[in-house]
Amino acid sequence: MTQPIHILNGPNLNLLGTREPDVYGTLSLKEIEQACARHARDLGYEILFRQSNHEGELIDWLHDANVNACAVVFNPAAFTHTSVALHDAVRAIEPPVIEVHLSQTAAREAFRHHSYIALAARGSITGLGLQSYLLGINAAITSLGN
């Protein structure tokens, strides 16, 4: 059986649905997880969906994905703009990593315009709400063939 796609989520994403719905939408993280699971299953894949507010835990999960995932869809949230350590962890693993964001980070505050993760990821999908995740799953699967 194919290894699962790991979908990793960074800080404050546990507050989705109530935190700044004008920016992030009204879906909860649980609803995003359910939609991702259905979408991946329709494509013949399972997912492992996780969220942490702690940088080190996300790094550990990326290391784990190197052995236990076929691909990673990663929303590092605010760590996108600050974490060289997450950049290095993404570079250190073999499975393709697709960076995703619900909001269009390039259209927000200037400090959100730079992504350390994009420098290491296979690709990035931003600004499409839930579709960012679903397209991220598609891109991750497509990347497996390359």
UniProtKB/Swiss-Prot annotation:
Subunit description: Homododecamer.
Known function: Catalyzes a trans-dehydration via an enolate intermediate.
Reactions catalysed, as given in the entry: 3-dehydroquinate = 3-dehydroshikimate + H2O
Family, per entry: Belongs to the type-II 3-dehydroquinase family.
Pfam family, one: DHquinase_II
Biological process terms in GO annotation: amino acid biosynthetic process; aromatic amino acid family biosynthetic process; chorismate biosynthetic process; quinate catabolic process
Xref: HAMAP family: AroQ
Pathway noted in the entry: Metabolic intermediate biosynthesis; chorismate biosynthesis; chorismate from D-erythrose 4-phosphate and phosphoenolpyruvate: step 3/7
Cysteines engaged in disulfide bonds, as pairs: none
EC numbers, comma separated: 4.2.1.10
Residues the UniProt record annotates as site (Transition state stabilizer): 19
Catalytic site: 24 (proton acceptor), 101 (proton donor)
Molecular functions (GO terms): 3-dehydroquinate dehydratase activity
The protein's name in its UniProt record: 3-dehydroquinate dehydratase
Keyword terms, alphabetized: Amino-acid biosynthesis, Aromatic amino acid biosynthesis, Lyase
Species the sequence originates in: Maricaulis maris (strain MCS10) (Caulobacter maris)
InterPro entries linked to this entry: DHquinase_II, DHquinase_II_CS, DHquinase_II_sf
Residues binding substrate: 75, 81, 88, 102-103, 112
